[in-house]
Regions:
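Conserved active-site-adjacent core of cysteine acyl-enzyme catalytic domains
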Residues: 99-127
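Alpha-helix capping and helix-loop boundary segments enriched in small/acidic/polar residues
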Residues: 1, 54, 112-116, 140
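Short, well-ordered strand-loop elements centered on a beta-strand within folded domains, enriched
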Residues: 41-45, 106-109, 113, 158-164
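Short, structured interface segments
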Residues: 39-53
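Intrinsically disordered, low-complexity repeat and linker tracts
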Residues: 51-60, 118, 166-170
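Hydrophobic/aromatic-rich core segments of domains that either
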Residues: 120-170
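Secondary-structure boundary elements
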Residues: 53-110
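Intrinsically disordered, low-complexity N-terminal segments that are enriched in acidic
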Residues: 1-42
Length: 170
């Protein structure tokens, strides 16, 4: 369990699980060649992300705007978590039919467009909680045989499940 919830307090909100679950695909290639020194290998990694640099700047600005709007910096941890969770579930709609306009798996879709699938919900929730120093992780799994992701959050030494996708609109 300790390894599953390992947490690095020094990471900013855009690192850690946010970075891990914000890539679209990784292509790995290995090339072998030979020169006068002998055989060599060249490893090439191509990483594509769910959002562009410009979109991430917009997400960062929106995260700061949301936290300022919620005015929770002086609140206790439970109130902070509840208010952030209520914001996400009340302002993001589940929509998997909008693939042509933007990537519904991204925090950008959730924060800026207000429509996302579970990954977008979880990425936005992760960013908001992480930004104010609340330990949380993203958990991949499945729901009824379909891929799903949700968050866990640490409070008073215990970890709790948060699934903003299933609570949207509440």
């Amino acid at each position: 369990l300790d390894a599953a919830v390992a947490y690095d307090d020094s990471l900013p909100g855009m690192a850690g699980d946010y970075l891990r679950y914000n890539y679209n695909r990784i292509v790995r290639r290995v090339y072998q060649g030979e020169n006068s020194s002998g055989i060599y290998y060249r490893f090439v990694f191509e990483i594509s992300y769910l959002s562009s640099y410009e979109q991430e700047l917009a997400v960062e600005e929106k995260v700061q705007e949301i936290l300022s709007e919620l005015n929770i910096y002086d609140s206790d941890r439970e109130t902070q978590i509840r208010n952030i969770y209520a914001y996400v579930t009340g302002n993001v709609k589940y929509d998997n039919m909008i693939y042509e306009t933007f990537n519904v798996h991204s925090a950008y879709a959730a924060a800026i467009e207000g429509k996302a699938v579970c990954q977008g919900y979880s990425l936005l929730l992760y960013r908001l909680l992480q930004e104010i120093g609340i330990k949380n992780r993203m958990v991949p799994g499945d729901a009824g045989g379909v891929g799903h992701v949700w968050n866990i959050v640490e409070m008073d030494g215990r970890w709790y499940n948060l699934d903003a996708t299933w609570d949207w609109g509440t």
